[in-house]
């Protein structure tokens, strides 16, 4: 049994982690923590997230020193802000824990990236070298030996799962950059109250145009430039990405289908559509990424959907943990 600590459990992704870990037959929750300054410290997780009432009624304990919680812990999930994960991950690693970080603090092996896109100076270049990028379907072998796993961002997960098989099969004309138009539910902005995320204010609107930090994450791990425009949708959760690409001359629809099938035939958390494209409602509350596509001449449109809190965060983190410790990838997820 893996003793498991969830840090930052009060947020939306944190609550999903609690759900997944609680029903995992090989994991035991030792504690749920929040920062010592959090207004949620001392509250029950089930008071903040009533879907957990009668299932997990543990308190959210304030954490100011990891030594209060790290002894005997095997696994730590960090559902914390980027700067917080940056500071906590090395401490838990030194304490002998395997760390799964849901923030962006260790996703890109380039210290200058964090100054430009995250606004802080990265102090641990050696950990950037060591961290395994947790795109579970593609990086499984690296995960098996890693002690620090950087769980990908929500948008990058869907984008890479859709595009990587086609790039690796050399089917795309990358002189025309793939264009990713992505829409996420409001939960992607976190649980903290903000006027812009309130019911009467939120609308379908692009944001972070040409400046969003997920663009370089996608491009770095694909090894190809992309144009990425995120949108905030007026619904609670889920991501839908419509990706427009140009195929190389002579590439057929059958070749696109074959590349996707070969990539995901034995990957249970990616579901491919033989016909049509996926709808968001079919992945909300589930750990899958659904992918469909259409071809017209040299033009390809791929649609990928996922739950941003599950396949885009908590479920993928647990999927990575399953791979790391040799369990079935879908353990506790489906």
From Swiss-Prot:
It comes from the Bacteria. The gene is argC. One of its GO terms (cellular component) is cytoplasm. InterPro entries: AGPR_AS (IPR023013), AGPR_type-1 (IPR000706), NAD(P)-bd_dom_sf (IPR036291), NAGSA_dehydrogenase (IPR050085), Semialdehyde_DH_NAD-bd (IPR000534). Its main location: cytoplasm. Its EC number is 1.2.1.38. The lineage of its organism: Bacteria, Pseudomonadati, Pseudomonadota, Gammaproteobacteria, Enterobacterales. Transmembrane segments: none annotated. SUPFAM superfamilies: Glyceraldehyde-3-phosphate dehydrogenase-like, C-terminal domain, NAD(P)-binding Rossmann-fold domains. GO terms for molecular function: N-acetyl-gamma-glutamyl-phosphate reductase activity; NAD binding; NADP+ binding. This is N-acetyl-gamma-glutamyl-phosphate reductase. Catalyzes the NADPH-dependent reduction of N-acetyl-5-glutamyl phosphate to yield N-acetyl-L-glutamate 5-semialdehyde. HAMAP family: ArgC_type1 (MF_00150). Belongs to the NAGSA dehydrogenase family. Type 1 subfamily. One of its GO terms (biological process) is L-arginine biosynthetic process. Disulfide bonds: none annotated. It catalyses: N-acetyl-L-glutamate 5-semialdehyde + phosphate + NADP(+) = N-acetyl-L-glutamyl 5-phosphate + NADPH + H(+). Pathway: Amino-acid biosynthesis; L-arginine biosynthesis; N(2)-acetyl-L-ornithine from L-glutamate: step 3/4. The active site is at 154. It is found in: Cytoplasm. Keywords: Amino-acid biosynthesis, Arginine biosynthesis, Cytoplasm, NADP, Oxidoreductase.
């Amino acid at each position: 049994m893996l003793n498991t600590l969830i840090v930052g459990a009060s947020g939306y992704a944190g609550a999903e982690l609690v759900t997944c870990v609680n029903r995992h037959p090989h994991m035991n929750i030792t504690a749920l923590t929040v920062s010592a300054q959090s207004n949620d410290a001392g509250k029950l997780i089930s008071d903040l997230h009533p879907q957990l009432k009668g299932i997990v009624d543990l308190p959210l304990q304030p954490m100011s020193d990891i030594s209060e919680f790290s002894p005997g812990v095997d696994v730590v999930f960090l559902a914390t802000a980027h700067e917080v994960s940056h500071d906590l991950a090395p401490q838990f690693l030194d304490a002998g824990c395997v760390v799964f970080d849901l923030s962006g603090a260790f996703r890109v092996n380039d210290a200058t990236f964090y100054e430009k896109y995250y606004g802080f100076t990265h102090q641990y270049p050696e950990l950037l070298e060591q961290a395994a990028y947790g795109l579970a379907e593609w990086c499984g072998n690296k995960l098996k030996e890693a002690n620090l796993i950087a769980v990908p961002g929500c948008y990058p997960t869907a984008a890479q799962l859709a595009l990587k098989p086609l790039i690796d099969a050399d089917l795309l004309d990358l002189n025309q950059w793939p264009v990713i138009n992505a829409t996420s539910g409001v939960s992607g902005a976190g649980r903290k109250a903000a006027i812009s995320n309130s019911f009467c204010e939120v609308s379908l609107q692009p944001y972070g145009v040409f400046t969003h930090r997920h663009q370089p994450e996608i491009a770095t791990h694909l090894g190809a430039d992309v144009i990425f425009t995120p949108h905030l949708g007026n619904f609670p959760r889920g991501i839908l990405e419509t990706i427009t690409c140009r195929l190389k001359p002579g590439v057929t629809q059958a070749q696109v289908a074959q590349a996707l099938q070969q990539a995901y035939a034995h990957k249970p958390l990616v579901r491919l559509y033989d016909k049509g494209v996926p709808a968001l409602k079919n992945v909300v509350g589930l750990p899958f990424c659904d992918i469909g596509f259409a071809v017209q001449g040299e033009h390809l449109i791929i649609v990928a959907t996922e739950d941003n809190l599950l396949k885009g965060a908590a479920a993928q983190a647990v999927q990575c943990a399953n791979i790391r410790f040799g369990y079935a990838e879908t353990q506790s997820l489906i």
